[in-house]
C-alpha cells in the first residue's frame, strides 16, 4: 500500500503537483479471501517554481550551477527534474555533498522555491617529477584545476627543465 501511495505521489509530483496527498484504504473481504484497495487522491494545485537558489558555493559561480539545472524557474515543479538537476551537480565533481529542499512560498499556495545546498571541495592537483638521463637532471612540476577560478573550466599548467631544454 505504501509503495503504491509513493508511486502515485511521485507521478503527480512529476506533473507539477508537489503537495499531492494520497492515502490508500484497504477493505478486507474475509469471505472471498481478498482485499480491496481504495486510493483517495487529492492532487491540490499545480505548483510552479518561483526561484532556484544555491547555498554554499563560495568559489563556484552561480551560472556554472544554473547551466546544470533541468528544472527551470517559472515552469511547473517536477520531482524528476529537481532530482536530475541534483544528480548533475553531484557529477560535476566540485562538491563533497549536494542537498536539495523544496520550500513553499509563504502566502502563495501555487509556488515553491528550490534550494540546493552544496559543500565545495578542492578540485585541483599538484604534481612533481625528478629524473636523470642522457641530458642530465630533469625537473618537472604541474598543476591542474577542474574548476579554474570558479568557472567550471579545466586549467593545466606544467613545466619540465633539464640542461638542454625547457618545456611548458
Per-range role (PLM):
Residues 1-137, 142, 156-167:
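Periplasmic polypeptide-binding modules associated with outer-membrane biogenesis and secretion
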Residues 148-154:
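Short loop/turn motifs that connect adjacent beta-strands in outer-membrane beta-barrel proteins
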Amino acid at each position: 500500500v505504501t509503495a503504491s501511495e509513493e508511486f502515485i505521489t511521485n507521478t503527480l509530483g512529476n506533473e507539477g503537483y508537489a503537495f499531492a496527498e494520497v492515502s490508500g484504504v484497504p477493505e478486507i473481504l474475509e469471505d472471498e479471501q481478498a482485499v480491496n484497495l481504495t486510493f483517495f487522491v487529492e492532487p491540490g494545485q499545480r505548483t510552479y517554481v518561483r526561484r532556484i537558489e544555491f547555498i554554499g558555493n563560495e568559489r563556484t559561480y552561480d551560472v556554472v550551477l544554473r547551466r546544470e539545472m533541468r528544472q527551470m524557474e517559472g515552469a511547473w515543479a517536477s520531482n524528476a527534474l529537481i532530482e536530475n538537476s541534483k544528480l548533475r551537480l553531484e557529477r560535476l565533481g566540485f562538491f563533497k555533498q549536494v542537498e536539495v529542499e523544496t520550500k513553499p512560498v509563504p502566502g502563495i499556495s501555487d509556488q515553491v522555491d528550490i534550494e540546493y545546498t552544496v559543500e565545495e571541495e578542492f578540485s585541483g592537483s599538484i604534481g612533481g617529477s625528478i629524473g636523470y638521463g642522457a641530458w642530465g637532471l630533469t625537473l618537472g612540476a604541474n598543476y591542474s584545476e577542474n574548476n579554474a577560478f570558479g568557472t567550471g573550466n579545466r586549467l593545466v599548467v606544467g613545466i619540465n627543465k633539464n640542461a638542454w631544454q625547457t618545456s611548458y
